[in-house]
Curated annotation (Swiss-Prot):
It is a multi-pass membrane protein. The keyword Flavoprotein does not apply. It comes from Bacillus subtilis (strain 168). This is Uncharacterized amino acid permease YbgF. The lineage of its organism: Bacteria, Bacillati, Bacillota, Bacilli, Bacillales. Keywords: Amino-acid transport, Cell membrane, Membrane, Transmembrane, Transmembrane helix, Transport.
Amino acid sequence: MNSAHNKNETTFQRSMKSRHLFMLSLGGVIGTGLFLSSGYTIQQAGPAGTILAYLVGAGIVYLVMLCLGELSVAMPVTGAFHTYAAKYIGPGTGFTVAWLYWLTWTVALGSEFTAAGLLMQRWFPHTSVWMWSAVFALFIFLLNAFSVKFFAESEFWFSSIKVLAIVLFILLGGSAMFGIIPIKGGEAAPMLSNFTAEGGLFPNGFVPILMTMLSVNFAFSGTELIGIAAGESVDPDKTIPKAIKTTVWRLSLFFVGTIFVLSGLIPIQDAGVIKSPFVAVFDRVGVPYAADIMNFVILTAILSAANSGLYASSRMLWSLSKEKTLHPTFAKLTSKGTPFNALVFSMIGGILSLLSSVFAPDTVYVVLVSISGFAVVVVWMGIAASQFMFRKRYIEAGNKVTDLKYRTPLYPFVPIAAFLLCLASVVGIAFDPNQRIALYCGVPFMAICYAIYYVKNRKSQPAADMTHSK
């Protein structure tokens, strides 16, 4: 199995550097949720509660990324955690993880193309949403189809715009909070008064904080893209650890800093009803054309997430095909090293998702969105379990841990803690009426994936043959 991978990996272009991996991960994580939904989160959990939830979420994702780092450096293959799960947990689990992750991103593609079309109507009110959706879908497809280097460079600049907007927001908003720069209209600097007003730091108690933690895990989804890109990165033993370290701490800074400034400048009773809290803050500090600037930033955020999503979903199909669990046509690469057939199929999936949001928004689309939200945490659990089993079998095979170029620290505590914390998030979904449907849809979908795999492969070689140590 390893030899097959190594033979094929030479056909992929190892073009991604550490800066590309870092921005690819940011591109998948920082989406419209931070720019549009953060005010609602603050209203539900309170200022301190939201910050606490994001800090805990960052801790969980850091544990998961430590596990992914060891796996990705030891086995830098395109497909990443699908391949690891198939090898170290079981082929049925690998198959299920791959389809869960593919569905997550293809569902996101549909909603992102629709949202991009709606945003363009601010500047072109008499044009069709669907025209813009088609234009952006073609644009994203071409970025991915041309070459890996072209994709990585475009994602770097997409993500750079988002990061610049967040950094400016934190600097300008923080300065206005503490009176360093004036607030429009001569209003006094609020300092930290909004943190203690309207019920204090935790105005709604601790239960809403727990519910916020569940959604915060989903907010951090996308960091695992670093693992998928391992097979196409330069010097993965150096670039992956560096990308993981910078991604997690900077994401934590961006998320927590944003929530801190929003909480300081927008009273909690207003936070949940403001359409775009970023626009509200930029407007208060006197930034001209704040609404248009943020419309552009959110548009790039959407296109960045779509760009990352099409990349991730196509690589999952390629990996499934290389593992002989999907038709071999999806493993074919162009002369530039891109899986064109997998890209086309993933784009079709995104378009079907878009159509379901139009023609069956309360049935098919709700089910798809629910499964995709549930899938992220399940994939993280798979990463933690894979690393636990990898290290165990690595040692059993007589290898030395010191020979690993990147080692997950505090083994086995880190993978066990990551797995249990993710499991707690999944269990917690059952107690939130708004998210419970994710379990009702996600668990049956997993069962169907397992059933399909074992029906198709009941005559294939035993799973034990696929779990030999590296």
